[in-house]
């Protein structure tokens, strides 16, 4: 399980950086953008989206060094010249016997310094999931805490592409704390005010991919999903889905989920989104054979190939109450009706 998670972590980080660099490249800069070095107010009725990916190292108060496996990816709305809101996925590296990651909702204050430099201070609630051991038994611990950061941006491309240095501090309730220094890239995008999903159409998608229980020595399985999604304006959507997680002898769940989605269009054809909601499932490997209520957390990148068809990549995390958390990396194809 540890090797698989390392491969997944590298894939997520590498693909995030490569994709962000591609989308923010000179060939994608709009001709009508302002020449000013720092972001300015968006055009009326047009959202401005910020995306970033950072990587680095740090230490935890339990387990020590993160072994250069800490990283964070996030995206959100730029509200004005100074304030933004974000959703982020944070992986706190690999301290000894701890593999903690999770999702944070952040408020951010940005202060321009000079022509190309800006200081940024962010903080918000952080829901974490830690794969560890308690009394020599595998445990998936869930805790709430606060993720706070101070960062410096240097804009390489005016009003667009920037380099970022970020210091993170995680303060947990009843768990260990951590500090990390991260380096990476980011970009501001003029979000399309009318993304494809905002036209009121129902989107039906099918998904397939890998499914891995967050325990040592558990084989990887195939997972599948069928989903129906509807928009709520330009920034939100809701969905209902049937989820099959495979059966590896430890977890064999299937069930139905409902999620609320935050949707951020970064190009006329590209959209980032994150969803969360309840997931009711039955586990064939559970002796009680009873229904259980879990949480399904998702992050997704979508390309609108045509007006009717979209292709997507998605990461699902099934957060359980019985130490059988599951990671699903999936590709999907959806059609608008």
Segment roles from a protein language model:
Residues 2-16:
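Bacterial N-terminal signal peptides that target proteins for export
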Residues 14-24:
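Bacterial N-terminal signal peptides
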Residues 27-91, 180-232, 236, 328-336:
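Short glycine/proline- and aromatic-enriched beta-strand/turn motifs that initiate or cap beta-hairpins
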Residues 53-61, 69, 89-95, 125-133, ...:
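Transmembrane beta-strands of outer-membrane beta-barrel pores
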Residues 65-71, 99-103, 142-148, 177-181, ...:
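Residues that define the transmembrane beta-barrel architecture of outer-membrane proteins
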Residues 77, 109-111, 154-156, 187-189, ...:
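Residue-level signature of outer-membrane beta-barrel architecture
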Residues 81-87, 115-119, 156-165, 191-197, ...:
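Repeated loop/turn-to-beta-strand initiation elements of outer-membrane beta-barrel proteins
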Residues 126-142, 147, 151, 269-304:
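Outer membrane beta-barrel transmembrane domains
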């Amino acid at each position: 399980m540890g090797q698989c998670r390392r491969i997944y972590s590298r894939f997520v980080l590498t693909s995030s950086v490569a994709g962000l660099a591609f989308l923010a490249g000179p060939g994608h800069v709009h001709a009508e953008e302002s020449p000013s070095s720092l972001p300015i107010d968006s055009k009326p009725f047009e959202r401005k989206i910020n995306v970033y990916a950072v990587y680095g190292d740090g230490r935890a108060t339990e387990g020590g060094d993160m072994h250069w496996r800490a990283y964070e990816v996030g995206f959100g709305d730029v509200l004005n010249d100074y304030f933004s809101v974000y959703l982020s996925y944070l992986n706190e590296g690999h301290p000894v016997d701890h593999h903690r990651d999770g999702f944070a909702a952040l408020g951010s204050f940005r202060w321009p310094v000079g022509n190309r430099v800006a200081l940024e201070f962010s903080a918000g609630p952080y829901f974490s999931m830690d794969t560890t051991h308690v009394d020599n038994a595998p445990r998936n611990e869930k805790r709430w805490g606060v993720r706070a950061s101070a960062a410096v941006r240097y804009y390489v491309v005016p009003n667009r592409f920037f380099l970022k240095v970020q210091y993170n501090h995680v303060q947990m309730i009843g768990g260990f704390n951590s500090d990390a220094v991260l380096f990476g890239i980011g970009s501001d995008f003029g979000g399309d005010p009318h993304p494809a999903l905002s036209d009121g159409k129902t989107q039906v998608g099918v998904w397939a991919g890998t499914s891995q229980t967050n325990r040592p020595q558990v084989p990887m399985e195939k997972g599948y999903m069928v989903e129906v999604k509807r928009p709520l304006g330009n920034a939100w959507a809701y969905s209902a889905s049937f989820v099959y997680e495979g059966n590896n002898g430890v977890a064999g769940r299937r069930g139905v989920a409902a999620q609320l989605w935050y949707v951020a269009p970064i190009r006329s054809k590209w959209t980032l989104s994150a969803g969360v909601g309840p997931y009711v499932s039955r586990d064939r490997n559970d002796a009680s054979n009873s229904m259980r209520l879990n949480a399904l957390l998702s992050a997704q990148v979508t390309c609108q190939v045509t007006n009717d068809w979209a292709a997507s990549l998605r990461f699902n995390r099934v957060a359980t109450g019985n130490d059988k958390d599951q990671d699903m990396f999936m590709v999907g194809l959806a059609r608008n009706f």
